[in-house]
Amino acid sequence: MGAPKQRWTSEEEAALRAGIARHGVGKWRTILKDPEFSSTLCYRSNVDLKDKWRNMNVIVSTSSSRDKAKSALKRIRTIPKNNEHTMAITRVTSDIDDEIVDEKPIVSLPSEAKNTSSSKKSHRLDNIIMEAIKNLNEPTGSHRTTIANYIEEQYWPPSDFDHLLSAKLKDLSTSGKLIKVNRKYRIAPSSPNSERRSPKMPLLEDVQREPVKIWSDDTKTLTRSQVDAELARMATMTAEEASVAAARAVAEAEAIMAEAEAAAKEAEAAEAEAQAAQAFAEAAFLTLKNRNAGKLVIALIHASLCYILPCFISYHI
């Protein structure tokens, strides 16, 4: 058994550090032979120096890590607590020194803030819809499907986007920002009285903008000037005159519907006649085909008799 190991003294550790600083790590024999350190390290071998140096490095690294952890823990404890809102502490580990990044609180929004955010989202959806209709720039307006396809190509809509789009288009049409004609939407013309306009005003504007057909006996299409004159005359009508004009328009509409029904009946009758004629033609074709087949059979029988009978008679004679 060798001699028991003795604890390292502070003088020996100081001599070891000075020797490494002078000669470098791994030069254990050189350090032991150095006259300045040989007297202090006379009871140590090169293996002892190597082990001690390794242990000293481990102790130093462990203590530094503990110091960093303690400082980080103190930093976390010094963060003020918020009783009204919840805090989320995000720790990011660094490969260099394992520092802790400053925490950012994730604050739960109150009901007023949520309402504000929802109103902002609704306003943003309004702007997106108006932008889509403006960029599509279709003369007669854009269909809901066309608007949805444009928004889906430009943005990332939510899962319930179709429902939101339908509701928002309805709201915009009711408020007068959009005009709906034949399931198509277009932006209403801006005017100073747009805010005071009733929900039914877009229909009147549509009558002014679109080519209007006034049905009469000759069914003619009025021009823009004629439409303006007619609208001006309607604006100056009394209640009695307006009721008479409405009754006349209803009567004209009923007459047009009656004419349409009569035309539909005539079309059905013509279609029935065409089907009957086609059936007659098919029957005649089948009859002619069967008749030609019968004639062909008779001709074959006659030809066979003309050939067989002379042969039979000559054989018996």
UniProtKB/Swiss-Prot annotation:
Q: Which UniProt keywords apply?
A: Chromosome, Coiled coil, DNA-binding, Nucleus, Telomere, Transcription, Transcription regulation
Q: Which SMART domains match?
A: H15, SANT
**Domain named H15: residues:** 121-189
User: DNA-binding region(s): which residue ranges?
Assistant: 28-57
A GO molecular-function descriptor: double-stranded telomeric DNA binding
Q: Which residues form a coiled coil?
A: 244-288
Q: Where is the HTH myb-type domain?
A: 1-61
What's the protein name?
A: Single myb histone 6
Query: What is the source species?
Result: Zea mays (Maize)
